[in-house]
């Protein structure tokens, strides 16, 4: 590329056929997208996987940070999605219809949506990653969600039924 473009500005303004020759384009691998839904792959135990689409609410925005964890203590894996995409290419527009989402596992490879106001996990930002930790030392898993050009948010789990939600923004 350095031989074809002397500045980043020239490269940014170039069309595809300015960047690559027809021969280079013909030799490239071409991919197609056949599934745009967010979902999970379920292992059938026989060496194959089946794709299962997540709920409609999970489709409102792409999920970037995903945690598979038993959040409610029922020994069934739940999912947490850190969602939104505020800065796609201009032609596509923002994909920011979510607050991030908790999906409660049912044990049969299906998940029920837990609304953000019920879970207490509300992240209206351009969320990009999620991880589990125990930042308060109580042996319960806590959640940390970071956002592109935004705050890092911590969500503290509790066994106290009198405490509805606890959020720590850093």
Give each language-model segment a name:
Residues 1-170:
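Beta-propeller-forming repeat regions
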């Amino acid at each position: 590329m350095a031989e074809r473009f002397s500045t980043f500005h020239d490269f940014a303004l170039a069309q595809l056929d300015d960047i690559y020759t027809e021969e280079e384009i013909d030799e490239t691998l071409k991919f197609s997208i056949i599934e745009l839904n967010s979902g999970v792959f379920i292992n059938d135990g026989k060496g194959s996987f089946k794709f299962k689409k997540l709920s409609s609410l999970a489709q409102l925005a792409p999920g970037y940070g995903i945690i598979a964890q038993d959040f409610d203590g029922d020994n069934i894996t739940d999912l947490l999605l850190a969602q939104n995409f505020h800065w796609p290419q201009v032609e596509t527009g923002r994909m920011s219809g979510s607050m991030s989402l908790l999906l409660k596992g049912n044990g049969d490879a299906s998940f029920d949506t837990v609304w953000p106001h019920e879970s207490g996990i509300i992240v209206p930002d351009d969320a990009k990653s999620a991880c589990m930790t125990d930042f308060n030392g109580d042996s319960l898993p806590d959640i940390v969600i970071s956002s592109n050009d935004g705050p890092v948010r911590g969500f503290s789990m509790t066994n106290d039924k009198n405490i509805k939600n606890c959020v720590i923004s850093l």
